[in-house]
Amino acid sequence: AMCWWGEAYANGLNINAGMSEEQNRMAIFAVKQAERLSANASEIEKALIAAQAARFPDDLSADRMELERQYSAMMVKAAKQFPQSDDLAVLAAESAMNTTPWDYWDPATNEARPQIATAISLIERVIANNPRHPQASHLYIHLMENSPDPKMAEAAADRLVANAPPALGHLVHMPG
């Protein structure tokens, strides 16, 4: 079930790229397979699959950003339900970032947008639990780079330099 979940996840949009109709169709197919195979999945896995199912309904004409907001709400709820899962918290934070790509801070107030404040809180929780979590450090840099105080992510950048395998080019370039 989780292999199919991953297929759906990989076809979804992210902060750097939208998704084509073909990717949407592939994600819909994949999430249906994940649902079909989920009987023996863990509770966390079932929550992840349910969130992806909400993200990729059969209706190709559905408002993509509204679906992303629904997906994010389900992911944040799951992260609160299973606070022991750092990976789930990181995925939930990423889902919140996808609802407002590269527009994380209100320029009038210098405050994080509400869903981004949630993402920051989730990522900071993961970093406190597992400072070497590479995706938590990666996302924290992105969350803070346009904040009023980007130096808040300096320690995360230092950890990426020290711990990211050189083959992970995007992560290795992040601290620069």
Located regions from the model:
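Short coil/linker segments at helix-helix boundaries
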Residues: W4-Q84, L91-A128, R132, S137-A167, ...
